[in-house]
Amino acid sequence: MPIGPPPPEKMMFQLSLRRRGISDQAVLRAMDEVPRDAFVEPGQRAEAWLDTALPIACGQTISQPFVVAYMTEQMQLRPEHRVLEIGTGSGYQAAILSRLSRAVLTLERFKTLADQARARLAALHCDNVEVRIGDGFAVPADAGLFDRIIVTAAMEEVPASLLDRLDLDGVLIAPVGPHNATQTLLRIRKSKSGIERKELVAVRFVPALPGLAREL
């Protein structure tokens, strides 16, 4: 199991996050503790500590570290929170979330990715993360409500069924927009008075697709 970058790369990794505005110490600590090289293909481990997205299996990507840190910071997580992640991918984002919350349920439509992520998370003792093969547009009925929801693939719009899974005072972070162009990262807060939406930054994510993958 990889153990993270050598000291110079580790220092530059943290410095790059701080320079780009990440200031939440808990988020920075989680980014420091989770070895990103454990979540990429063996031939890409030399690139794992660069601030860039990398390809993974099933035509998907592992997001660049700044985007992971930024989305996590915008969630305003607390240790008692229960989190839903739509799009497990490599499992890297779930590992970060596991350091900052009580429990994480992460859904992945590709069996290959779900199996790989489950093994990686187990190796890192992320025991509060449950990986399920599932459709992010149809969250399982037994899942209950969540304090925070994060979507790691682009939705053309956030479905009402997903907002229904958000508890009062909950926050949802998702890239929203067309699949073949730049999207907008949205932060949605649910309160007794209704739904509040805030546009954050422009992003580019792979598309979120309904249903389970027929292959892979």
Curated annotation (Swiss-Prot):
It is found in: Cytoplasm. Gene3D superfamilies: Vaccinia Virus protein VP39. One of its GO terms (molecular function) is protein-L-isoaspartate (D-aspartate) O-methyltransferase activity. The keyword Cytoplasm applies. Its EC number is 2.1.1.77. The keyword Glycoprotein does not apply. Keywords: Cytoplasm, Methyltransferase, S-adenosyl-L-methionine, Transferase. Pfam families: PCMT (PF01135). NCBIfam families: pimt, PRK00312.1. Catalyzes the methyl esterification of L-isoaspartyl residues in peptides and proteins that result from spontaneous decomposition of normal L-aspartyl and L-asparaginyl residues. It plays a role in the repair and/or degradation of damaged proteins. PANTHER family: PROTEIN-L-ISOASPARTATE O-METHYLTRANSFERASE, PROTEIN-L-ISOASPARTATE(D-ASPARTATE) O-METHYLTRANSFERASE. This is Protein-L-isoaspartate O-methyltransferase. It comes from Rhodopseudomonas palustris (strain BisB18). The gene is pcm.
